[in-house]
Amino acid sequence: MFEARLVQGSVLKRVLEALKDLITEACWDLGSGGISLQSMDSSHVSLVQLTLRSEGFDTYRCDRNIAMGVNLNSMSKILKCAGNEDIITLRAEDNADTLALVFEAPNQEKVSDYEMKLMDLDVEQLGIPEQEYSCVVKMPSAEFARICRDLSHIGDAVVISCAKDGVKFSANGELGNGNIKLSQTSNVDKEEEAVTIEMNEPVQLTFALRYLNFFTKATPLSPTVTLSMSADVPLVVEYKIADMGHLKYYLAPKIEDQQEGS
């Protein structure tokens, strides 16, 4: 049997909002250590990896490993029925073909329960190699979302150039071009407002803005975002989920002088 209770149910709502536009269905792997999900998007360009550790839940029980095929759009629709303050409990029997979702109002005066049909999914797990990155940029997540949104009005790809003193985002299009440069902040009162750069060697890579704008749907999950880059390997865009885990997106760089991203 599986049962997980989350007093801060809004976290789960935000996770689904961050996933549903990029991937339509995915296998949730439930185990004693927590919940994980790994999936390519439908066009096989980007990869999503989610970890929610068991200790981040208020109660968590998973007697044996379960692979649960979920239509993310359906789950998102059901979670929209939960209030932001609601306590959310997920429950499934070992060989169940449904997932129960229970929403309790904080005052205990209203309890809603839903059952969602599960899917049979044939999923191949991709190994994600551990990697040292040439540049790691940590910045406010809302700032990154704004940059991606603004530059997508200019062009459909962004060049991210990372050097010791700052990181530059550039786009070219029919109307002209745009450049946004962020300098490393030296002293900021609030850590989440800082821009920090760890650089082993400078990097300049091009990425499709369409996908970055999908990734920034995760902005409400975390005040900061971390971008990890190296030549010829996928960019990692990571949002920490406080006390629980993380949501990571991987996107391969576009090869220069080619129309199609590889």
Curated annotation (Swiss-Prot):
GO BP terms, alphabetized: leading strand elongation; mismatch repair; regulation of DNA replication; translesion synthesis
Pfam families (alphabetical): PCNA_C, PCNA_N
CC per GO annotation: chromatin; nucleoplasm; nucleus; PCNA complex; PCNA-p21 complex
Subcellular localization: Nucleus
Keyword Ubl conjugation tagged: yes
Record feature DNA-binding region, as residue ranges: 61-80
Record has Ribosomal protein as a keyword: no
PTM info: Monoubiquitinated by the UBE2B-RAD18 complex on Lys-164. Monoubiquitination at Lys-164 also takes place in undamaged proliferating cells, and is mediated by the DCX(DTL) complex, leading to enhance PCNA-dependent translesion DNA synthesis.
Keywords from the UniProt entry: DNA replication, DNA-binding, Isopeptide bond, Nucleus, Ubl conjugation
PROSITE patterns: PCNA_1, PCNA_2
Coiled-coil regions, chain positions: none
InterPro entries for the chain: DNA_clamp_sf, Pr_cel_nuc_antig, Pr_cel_nuc_antig_C, Pr_cel_nuc_antig_CS, Pr_cel_nuc_antig_N
Self-association state and partner proteins as the record states: Homotrimer. Forms a complex with activator 1 heteropentamer in the presence of ATP. Interacts with DNMT1. Interacts with CHAF1A. Component of the replisome complex.
Function: This protein is an auxiliary protein of DNA polymerase delta and is involved in the control of eukaryotic DNA replication by increasing the polymerase's processibility during elongation of the leading strand.
Family, per entry: Belongs to the PCNA family.
Listed name of the protein: Proliferating cell nuclear antigen
Name of the encoding gene: PCNA
